[in-house]
Amino acid sequence: MDISPRTRPDLPLPSAAIAEPTRHEPDAGGHFGVYGGRYVAEALMAVIEEVTTAYEKERVNQDFLDTLDYLQANYAGRPSPLYEAPRLSEQAGARIFLKREDLNHTGSHKINNVLGQALLAQRMGKKRVIAETGAGQHGVATATACALLGLECVIYMGAVDTERQALNVARMRLLGATVVSVQSGSKTLKDAINEAFRDWVTNADNTFYCFGTAAGPHPFPAMVRDFQRIIGLEARAQIQAQAGRLPDAVLACIGGGSNAIGIFHPFIDDPGVRLIGFEAAGDGVETGRHAATFSGGSPGAFQGSFSYLLQDEDGQTIESHSISAGLDYPGVGPEHAWLRERVSTTRGWVRNTRGCARFRTLCRTEGIIPAIESAHAVAGALKVAPELGKAAIIVVNLSGRGDKDVETAAQWFGLLGSSDR
């Protein structure tokens, strides 16, 4: 298959991110050290093993890889640019480069993973795809891929999130998806995942669960990471071409962790590169109203794997909170937990107030409206830049665009008046 005029020979293809195992693979049971594994009902074990077998087959199937490369280049718009942000850099006091995943088709990094999983579902003969979504970006990407491939699509979304991300709900429905508003629990992302798992148990014969983040039971953490690694592979080549060296730090926001693991992974073996993830601190970690899993959580089993989560002394999940729907999740992917202990990755946190402030900062310095999730990473960059110094190079993963968050931001900043004069 002809790959496309858009493909740049100096940058890696998406297939390069999945065809060969990395030096940091889970064991046969899906464990990264003590983290990961499969903590699921017996009824799901067979279908999860079916997904594992199919993925291991297709990741070395040249026809699958060529099709993925073709769609990523011609349909999704890869490679995404790496943009040096001059006015943001001036304010930060360091050289800031933005990896523009917001420019992908559907407006975020989510399409990288979804195209891979939807192709896998099609090759497995599944006619129906289900997915969970928080901010709606994964839901939109899944609905998009299903429309492209002619698959039935059902999206589970917490009722709180359907209200604060109404624009993305409309997009999903326009694309032909059925959106199920989940009324249980906190009515956010974790509850949407629970409902999706229940659906999968009931309809496993004809249904594929397109998991949106690098969490859940094996093989999802590794598979989602593989489809997202193209972010970091491109960024690594781009920064060396533009700046002549590797960055001093690579930053990303962290909820479940797919955008972060995607950009971090190709830099893991570079000792001079700091990998820093910024969690959503909500109203402040000390208040208990936050989604900072590492800062305020502890290890435990949650939604299919063993990792860090927000839980009480009895092991019951604590409700998370963030103005960002995509970061409003009380767990994190197991590979992040492992990397936190084994590699030079660190975690910081950003409150709602600072995340929203840096949302506006990026709008007014660079003319880029980011997702509120991504604004947490921008806030992190302005936080660490003084420590690193003016000569430092910082790569920030701008994981998504902020169309979906304009109403939230307008309410936060009081921008809804009829006139400025």
From Swiss-Prot:
Q: What is its EC number?
A: 4.2.1.20
Cofactor(s) required for function per UniProt: pyridoxal 5'-phosphate
- Does the keyword field hold Transport? no
Q: Which GO terms describe its molecular function?
A: tryptophan synthase activity
As its record notes, the protein acts as a catalyst of: (1S,2R)-1-C-(indol-3-yl)glycerol 3-phosphate + L-serine = D-glyceraldehyde 3-phosphate + L-tryptophan + H2O
Xref: InterPro entries? Trp_synth_b_CS, Trp_synth_beta, Trp_synth_beta/beta-like, TrpB-like_PALP, TrpB-like_PALP_sf
Main role?
A: The beta subunit is responsible for the synthesis of L-tryptophan from indole and L-serine.
Q: What is the official name of this protein in its record?
A: Tryptophan synthase beta chain
Which source organism does the UniProt entry give? Mycobacterium intracellulare
Lineage of source species: Bacteria, Bacillati, Actinomycetota, Actinomycetes, Mycobacteriales
Which gene carries the instructions for this protein? trpB
